[in-house]
C-alpha cells in the first residue's frame, strides 16, 4: 500500500489540504497522512526551526479518515518532521497543497507550499506542489481531482531524482478549464511598496504591499498557461547550477 504525505503552508485546518485529503482518501490502496503547520505560514520560503522544539499534535478534522497532525513550525519543518519522525514508514509521495493562491514563476522561491514539497526530493521522494489561482474561491474540487490523477501517475511512473512537479490550477468552472500544459518557470515580478506606520509607543514599522508588474511571458511559461485557462505542470529540479557558465567562470582564473 502506497503511503502519501499531505502537507501545506496554509495550515492543517485550511480548506485546500482538506479537500485534497478527502479526495485522496477515496482512492483504494493508498494510506494518507496529513501533517501541516498549526496556522497560516504562507511565504515562509524554506525556513526550518533550529532554535526551539517542534510540537506535533493530533487534531480532529470533521470527516477525516487519515491521521491529521499539526506542527508548531514552518511548512518545511512539517514535511521534514513527518518524513523523518512521524510517519510509520518512508512515504512514496509528498503532496503540498492545495494552496490558496497561485505559485507561479518566481513565486516558487518564496513559497512555503513549494518548500514543503521540496523536502520530498531533498530526501529522495517524488513530490507535487499544488495551488489554486485564487485567494477567495472555496471550490478546490477540480484541483483536488487533478492532483489525485497526477499523484497516481507519479506513483506509477516515478520522477527523476531531485524532481518535483509544480501544479497551478486556474480558478475556473471545471468545464471552462481548457486542458493541461507542461510548462517552464515564468517570471512574476511584484512592484513592492513598504507602507510605513508608527506604533502608539513611537516605534516605526512597515507592511509589505504592492502589486504584480506587467511582465511578458512566452507561451511555454506557467504564468501564460494559467492566464490562458490551462492547468500548468512544471517540472522543477533541486540542482540550480548554471552548467553553461562553469567554463566561463573558470576562464576568469580566480585565485586566492
UniProtKB/Swiss-Prot annotation:
Cofactor(s) this protein requires: a divalent metal cation
Cystines in this chain: none
Top-level taxon of the source organism: Bacteria
Keyword Protein transport: no
Cofactor remark from the record: Binds 1 divalent metal cation per subunit.
Keywords tagged on the record: Cytoplasm, Hydrolase, Metal-binding, Nucleotide-binding
Reactions listed under catalytic activity: a ribonucleoside 5'-phosphate + H2O = a ribonucleoside + phosphate
Residues binding a divalent metal cation: 9-10, 42, 99
UniProt enzyme class: hydrolase
Subcellular location: Cytoplasm
Signal sequence coordinates: none
Record-listed E.C. numbers: 3.1.3.5
GO molecular function: 3'-nucleotidase activity; 5'-nucleotidase activity; exopolyphosphatase activity; metal ion binding; nucleotide binding
InterPro entries per the UniProt record, alphabetical: SurE (IPR030048), SurE-like_Pase/nucleotidase (IPR002828), SurE-like_sf (IPR036523)
Assigned GO CC terms: cytoplasm
Similarity section: Belongs to the SurE nucleotidase family.
Function: Nucleotidase that shows phosphatase activity on nucleoside 5'-monophosphates.
Name recorded for this polypeptide: 5'-nucleotidase SurE
Annotated organism of origin: Symbiobacterium thermophilum (strain DSM 24528 / JCM 14929 / IAM 14863 / T)
Lineage: Bacteria, Bacillati, Bacillota, Clostridia, Eubacteriales
Gene name per UniProt: surE
Amino acid at each position: 500500500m502506497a503511503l502519501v504525505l499531505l502537507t501545506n503552508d496554509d495550515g492543517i485546518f485550511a480548506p485546500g489540504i482538506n479537500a485534497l485529503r478527502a479526495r485522496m482518501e477515496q482512492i483504494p490502496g493508498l494510506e494518507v497522512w496529513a501533517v501541516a503547520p498549526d496556522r497560516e505560514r504562507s511565504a515562509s520560503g524554506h525556513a526550518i526551526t533550529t532554535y526551539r522544539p517542534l510540537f506535533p499534535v493530533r487534531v480532529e478534522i470533521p470527516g477525516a479518515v487519515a491521521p491529521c497532525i499539526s506542527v508548531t513550525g514552518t511548512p518545511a519543518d512539517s514535511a521534514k518532521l513527518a518524513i523523518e519522525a512521524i510517519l510509520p514508514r518512508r512515504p512514496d509521495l509528498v503532496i503540498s497543497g492545495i494552496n490558496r493562491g497561485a505559485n507561479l514563476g518566481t513565486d516558487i522561491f518564496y513559497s512555503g507550499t513549494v518548500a514543503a514539497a521540496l523536502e520530498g526530493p531533498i530526501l529522495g521522494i517524488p513530490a507535487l506542489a499544488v495551488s489554486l489561482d485564487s485567494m477567495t474561491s472555496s471550490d478546490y474540487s477540480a484541483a483536488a481531482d487533478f492532483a489525485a490523477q497526477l499523484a497516481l501517475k507519479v506513483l506509477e511512473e516515478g520522477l527523476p531524482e531531485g524532481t518535483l512537479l509544480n501544479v497551478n490550477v486556474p480558478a475556473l468552472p471545471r468545464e471552462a478549464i481548457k486542458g493541461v500544459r507542461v510548462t517552464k518557470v515564468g517570471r512574476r515580478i511584484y512592484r513592492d511598496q513598504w507602507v510605513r506606520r508608527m506604533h502608539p509607543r513611537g516605534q516605526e514599522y512597515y507592511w509589505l504591499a504592492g502589486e504584480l508588474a506587467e511582465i511578458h511571458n512566452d507561451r511555454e511559461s506557467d504564468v501564460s498557461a494559467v492566464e490562458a485557462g490551462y492547468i500548468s505542470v512544471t517540472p522543477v529540479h533541486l540542482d540550480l547550477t548554471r552548467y553553461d557558465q562553469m567554463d566561463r567562470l573558470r576562464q576568469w582564473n580566480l585565485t586566492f
